[in-house]
């Protein structure tokens, strides 16, 4: 027996006084289905007369009795680094791979993503517009993946942690909505917190006509009248604590000092030694990094040359934590 988010068995009933031998009656199930993402639900029905069982329809394999509740999970990776780390550049590309479960093959779906700021819990923007991306697809199997590709400028995002939110919609176009109105396999299924499924059953235990009704939350911009809507929200993956949805944009600051004086001044000698302490934040711990430094002439912006070569230095390190320091010695 399916249980709702409160641990209660999902049941319902309806009383009827039929005027004819053949007919229909709706049995409405209203429950918190927030715990059922990825589940397949089958509605079993009994008809009783004076508390005596006179009819049963309980076929676990009957598609007409079946409701599918999709589920999605995502993993966002930077196109260049291949990990959950991007640079604060003009042209950042992030691919969010959405893994879906329990869709109906042959129907059209749209997955829509938004880049969120983990600290402010608001969408990140470029030019005053939210950073979004989407993909429309028609799955060949119930379970699979689809990529959502984001391209944006991250120049202003140094030090920020981005979380990619995804929503999955069933597109109610002509092919989806009208291909076969009596086929339950092409009806709308949604894991909304408040879910209402209506099973139509006649009094002679016939179940050839089944319809699903979904109460849609206005917060999701879906009107309650599903006949008017072009899309229905069927799955959401929005978790600020999910590392798979997270992209970090590092930030570094440096402090250069003469090794002998410990200040920003040094004596003009042949064996000058400068220690540039690089403070970093928002790295992915456990990964290996390399800091590359170049001494630049402030008067003209050109590299400082010594013995015919640019004055450079580098340091490799494995970040134990997201925030820390490393010395680059020139």
Where are these regions (language model features)?
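Solvent-exposed loop/turn and edge beta-strand elements of beta-rich ligand-binding domains
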Residues: 1-330
């Amino acid at each position: 027996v399916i249980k709702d988010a409160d641990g209660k068995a999902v049941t319902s009933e309806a009383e009827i006084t039929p005027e004819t031998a053949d007919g229909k009656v709706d049995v409405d199930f209203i429950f918190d289905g927030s715990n059922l993402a990825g589940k397949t639900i089958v509605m079993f029905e009994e008809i009783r007369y004076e508390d005596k069982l006179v009819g049963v329809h309980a076929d676990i394999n009957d598609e007409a009795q079946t409701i599918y509740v999709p589920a999605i999970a995502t993993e966002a990776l930077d196109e260049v680094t291949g990990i959950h780390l991007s640079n604060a550049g003009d042209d950042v590309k992030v691919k969010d791979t959405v893994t879906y479960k329990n869709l109906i093959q042959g129907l059209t779906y749209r997955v829509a993503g938004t880049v969120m700021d983990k600290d402010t819990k608001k969408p990140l923007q470029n030019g005053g517009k939210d950073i979004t991306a989407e993909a429309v697809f028609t799955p060949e199997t119930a379970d699979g993946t689809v990529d959502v590709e984001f391209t944006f400028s991250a120049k202003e995002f140094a030090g920020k942690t981005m979380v990619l939110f995804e929503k999955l919609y069933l597109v109610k176009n002509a092919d989806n909505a009208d291909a076969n109105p009596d086929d339950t396999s092409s009806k709308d299924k949604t894991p909304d917190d408040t879910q209402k499924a209506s099973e139509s059953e006649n009094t002679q235990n016939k179940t050839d006509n089944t319809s699903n009704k979904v109460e849609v939350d206005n917060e999701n911009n879906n009107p309650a009248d599903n006949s008017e809507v072009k899309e229905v929200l069927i799955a959401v993956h929005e978790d600020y604590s999910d590392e798979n949805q997270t992209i970090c944009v590092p930030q570094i600051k440096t402090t250069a000092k003469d090794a002998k004086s410990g200040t920003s001044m040094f004596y003009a000698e042949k064996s000058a030694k400068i220690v540039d302490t690089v403070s970093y934040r928002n790295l992915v711990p456990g990964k290996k990094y390399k800091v590359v430094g170049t001494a630049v002439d402030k008067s003209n912006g050109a590299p400082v040359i010594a013995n015919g070569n640019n004055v450079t230095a580098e340091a490799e390190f494995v970040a134990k934590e997201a925030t820390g320091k490393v010395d680059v010695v020139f």
